[in-house]
Amino acid sequence: MVQRITVIGAGSTGHSAAAYLTQRGFTVTSHDDSRFSSRFEDISRLGGITLRGEAHGTFMPACLTTDPAQAVHKAQAIFVHVMADRHEEIARRIAPYLEDGQHIVIVPGNLGAFVFRSVFREMGISADVTLTEKEGNLCPCRLTAAAEVTVGLPIDAEGRAASLPASDTGRVL
């Protein structure tokens, strides 16, 4: 059973996912590059990520880091919550640190699994990981203040998902 999850992305959906998964009892690491370090500083200073609107409460992820090695190490699942134009960047950043058995879930997918697979092949990555995409986003949301996300509809942690190759879907769901 998955317990340790890394959420990549320090935008509104990444904040929402990190807070939601922390609320659900998972050990969450929140990661993005140094361009977003001030957001992690805000989360630390304010005692967590505050959810408003359709979700409520303040939740502190176990780890906030801009170090990809720290973010990926021992994560059982890696949720990628970034815009599609960052998929290649993220794939390249995490590739050297991947470990056998990890599940990479791209939300929303936008065919990102193909980008990740291409990058991993190009870089000669041999770790046995699954690549899965979730249809749609976790929830409509917006950063409304430092370390605060307003959620417009209930969080949809389920929805449709598929892996690449499709035969891996059963390993993930």
Regions from the PLM with identified roles:
Residues A84-A147:
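Rossmann-like NAD(P)(H) cofactor-binding subdomain of soluble oxidoreductases
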Residues A146-L173:
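Internal alpha-helical scaffold of NAD(P)-dependent oxidoreductase catalytic cores
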Residues A55-V105:
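Rossmann-like NAD(P)-binding element
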Residues M1-G53, V72:
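NAD(P)+-binding Rossmann beta1-loop-alpha1 motif at the extreme N-terminus of oxidoreductases
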Residues G47-P61, D128:
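Short mixed-charge
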Residues G9, D32, V82, P108, ...:
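Short beta-strand/turn micro-motifs composed of small residues
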Residues V2-Q3, V129, A157-G159:
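Nucleotide donor/acceptor-binding cores
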